[in-house]
């Protein structure tokens, strides 16, 4: 295997998944403050559950991947969608 791409099935080292999940969660937090989409109530509920269960941001992203895609697609947020795609394919 001569490819220098990190292999997530061997190690998550070098992928910086936690920091990228944190960044996506920051993007989500900003968006739900600015928006009145039907998704806002959904994500507020899920974020409250996340706090009660004390799960990390990467776990939340992995658990909510389809909902996050739908929400960021609705907003046409290309940066969030790109980051979400990266997280899904490299970290989850």
From Swiss-Prot:
The protein's role, per its UniProt record: Is required to sustain N(2)-dependent growth in the presence of low levels of carbon monoxide (CO). Probably acts by protecting the N(2) fixation ability of the nitrogenase complex, which is inactivated in the presence of CO.
Family listed: Belongs to the CowN family.
Protein name: N(2)-fixation sustaining protein CowN
Keywords associated with the record: Nitrogen fixation
Domain of life assignment: Bacteria
Source species of the chain: Cereibacter sphaeroides (strain KD131 / KCTC 12085)
Gene Ontology BP annotations: nitrogen fixation
